[in-house]
């Protein structure tokens, strides 16, 4: 009877198809502890794609229970009891966020039910059913710059007073063993070795339909994920289905302290392409069969653990490279890529000092952007976004970031997190001097805000016409730059409820944000009454001097509006209890 009830919940989840996950959700505290266990070398073979199915979670926890010290085993046993001790956990969460000096606030309340059940050793299901009462949608959440809501909320148009009532149903099923498994569900995804804001697939993007296949052997792992995305136009609106991303990777572990891998990605839309389902294929070559209609990227990763507790990670992700210039060692070449490098030291044994992490991320100009049609109002199926949010790094193109994070654990269940994040960003369009590009920018509607929606191409009715910076990489060479510094302090108390296997999670967080030149992320150029009719005229008919004069006027106006200072304070208090 119990199996029939669980199967009924599974079928209901697949039918409703409107949610995000629970016990294997990428923000579960389990994954934070897993990163610590990976840092000290207790775990060296976890797959790159998260979330993991219950089969893999059980394997990882059993390793810690067997090999960890007293404190590590205590945490692992608490997780084990929560995931595998009871089928259902019922609870609720409440969250209050205040942003000052704007005097804005965000309220979230949600009862929920968690489900973790093994119908068979080879077949597991998990999920979270919840109903949110909130005064903010996903796009309205009060978060620091370049961060996004962790709640998967879609506007359903139902209100109780001033509160939106939004159902969220996150679910997943898995078939297989820890060595070979296939998962299907709706959840957020992250792709290592940097899971927080991965340049491959970042956890900041709202949940997606996901189909994941993994082969995990002692010396190597093959990961493959097919995600169903939401397309938007180049202004972030007009949400449309039919956008997909396929990403696969091969990770090699010749030694316990060394791993490296290659990652291959294709993003496309308006059709389902079976050839991209083939494992161990090269997407760039595969799309060549159809005259290269899609957007392919390729990357590489490495992890080195030279001594216990010390971990070095790195990755590069190439979007579009000027290969002919690069192989000739020419100074000026097209480099559209992102990368992240980090060093972490984790205390090998349970200690009041848990870890310190320093990492650097860059996103070169036009990385993750892509031309897909001559009109900014039509869906873009090839840029690296989902539902209007960056799918890879949470940074915009032409940005970089350095981040220091430190975690203290003075008592069991009590975490004190301190971090400082410094971000630079500049609008690539400030460097545009080409007269053809300037003429189009001031006479036709384009996105010129320097975001992932701002591609390098100008168009006519026949498609692409010209491209910016084909033979150079003006990374952070602009006159007007945005500087953001975020100092974050957080206290978190996470305690198990021994009797039921549930948990209590309380958090109090504060972020001080300094934002210098906040208007950099606004459009620089736009058509107006002065340029009316220019789109149908040639540069000769208009006059180059007249075009440059109008472009200079708009650029000067943008610079005046971009410069300034803002200081923001974010205070967040949350409580979550599951019994």
Model-based region annotation:
Residues 4-14:
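Sec-dependent N-terminal signal peptides
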Residues 16-20:
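Sec/Tat signal peptide C-region and signal peptidase I cleavage site
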Residues 22-28, 39-259, 330, 350, ...:
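Outer-membrane beta-barrel channel domains
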Residues 89-95, 126-130, 183-187, 223-227, ...:
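Transmembrane beta-strands of outer-membrane beta-barrel proteins
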Residues 99-100, 154-159, 195-199, 233-238, ...:
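Extracellular loop and loop/strand-boundary signature of outer-membrane beta-barrel proteins
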Residues 181, 190, 202, 208-389, ...:
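Signature for the C-terminal beta-barrel architecture of outer-membrane proteins
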Residues 493-495, 565-579:
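Outer-membrane beta-barrel "beta-signal"
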Residues 499, 504-556:
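C-terminal beta-signal and adjacent terminal beta-strands/loops
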